[in-house]
Amino acid sequence: MTQFSLNDIRPVDETGLSEKELSIKKEKDEIAKLLDRQENGFIIEKMVEEFGMSYLEATTAFLEENSIPETQFAKFIPSGIIEKIQSEAIDENLLRPSVVRCEKTNTLDFLL
């Protein structure tokens, strides 16, 4: 004879999943949504336009709002936004001069 308690019975909703399985599924859906780099780029672009933030400020705010560590930005932020942050930093002299020399792109200013 098998013994069991009422705690062993899992409550099930209409989808057939327990509460724990539902919470895991919801968490996976949220992570999948955050991994959509293109959508994240649109959100950051919208923040820049609406609030007049720089790309660096908007990206930092996005990462903080979604509890994403700054070290993992490459998984969540599209390369186009990263390039815009780099160009902003160079234009606004936010980088050391030695770094700017390495990152400076070729221009046709000498033709002017």
From Swiss-Prot:
GO terms under biological process: late viral transcription
Pfam families in UniProt: Trans_coact
Annotated signal peptide: none
Gene3D superfamilies per the UniProt record, alphabetical: Phage late-transcription coactivator-like
Membrane-crossing residue ranges in chain numbering: none
Region entry Involved in transcriptional enhancement, spans: 106-112
Coiled coil: none
Superkingdom: Viruses
Region (Interaction with host RNAP): 62-92
GO molecular function annotations of the record: transcription regulator activator activity
Family according to the record: Belongs to the Tevenvirinae late transcription coactivator family.
Role noted for this protein: Activates transcription at late promoters when the sliding clamp is present. Binds to both the host RNA polymerase (RNAP) and the upstream dsDNA.
Note on domains (UniProt): The C-terminus is involved in transcriptional enhancement.
Subunit structure: Interacts with the beta subunit of host RNAP RpoB (via flap domain). Part of the transcription activation complex containing host RNAP, the viral RNA polymerase sigma-like factor, the coactivator gp33, and the sliding clamp.
Protein name: Late transcription coactivator
Organism annotation: Enterobacteria phage T4 (Bacteriophage T4)
Lineage: Viruses, Duplodnaviria, Heunggongvirae, Uroviricota, Caudoviricetes
